[in-house]
């Protein structure tokens, strides 16, 4: 008994429509699921120390950055911690040194939102074999705002921290990595720029994170041949102070991991592909959002932004 789509009595254009439908399902369902299964269960996490003995983490005193640094220390990597608050840096360094007495830790106090140059970072990493860079530092709006409501100081700081800092730090470390022909660079983007088609009332933030995504994916293609793995990681909500302030999410849940849970998944994905959403529930959300028409997602995101604006 023949199915409707392959019956010889059916007009040719029905066969064509069935074929197009098959290609659509292949593209939308099968290939993403196969890629997800392969990266989660078949590919072995890379041995991180092969990239080099030091790892540098920006925005390292709290949230995802601190958790990243802690996870890298578990792998025996020496740490360069960069953040603007010296006292917090010293506190984190002391905590890590007690827990991991066998590693070396260097702290660099630096405010990425300032107008000054990056000489302090250049001096701080001089002579060190930095094999892994985690470009984690990032800021967003203090509250949901229309584009015309964002003051110049706010959007200037967002551009400096999210865009300029990522570019500069990547540029400063990729040269030595190229000389050694090994290294890993992880740039943290956001679901606001990659997973959803728009992020109303946070437009500048989303635009900077879209830049991070495009930069990372292009650099992945450029430098893979030289042994440098450049990767864009795309988190959705993680239970951090910034997310608490923006989205009023103050504790972990099934779809909102703690920084520690997220970082464990994120470190395991270093060097595997040009772009990923490391936490399993985030990647599931990404897949499901991709099945919804963009205009519906846009309407949903706008309603969320307007509600947050009314409450601020």
From Swiss-Prot:
Which keywords, in A-to-Z order, does the entry hold?
Answer: Endoplasmic reticulum, Membrane, NADP, Oxidoreductase, Transmembrane, Transmembrane helix
Q: Which residues are the active-site ones?
A: 205 (proton acceptor)
Any one Pfam family here would be adh_short
Which InterPro entries does this entry report, sorted A to Z?
Answer: NAD(P)-bd_dom_sf (IPR036291), Sc_DH/Rdtase_CS (IPR020904), SDR_fam (IPR002347), VLCFA-Steroid_DH (IPR051019)
Give the CC-aspect GO terms.
endoplasmic reticulum; endoplasmic reticulum membrane
Tell me what topology the record assigns in the membrane: Single-pass membrane protein
A single Gene Ontology MF term assigned here is: ketoreductase activity
Protein known as: Very-long-chain 3-oxoacyl-CoA reductase-like protein At1g24470
Species whose genome carries this gene: Arabidopsis thaliana (Mouse-ear cress)
Q: What is the lineage of its organism?
A: Eukaryota, Viridiplantae, Streptophyta, Embryophyta, Tracheophyta
From the UniProt record, report the name of the gene that encodes this protein: KCR2
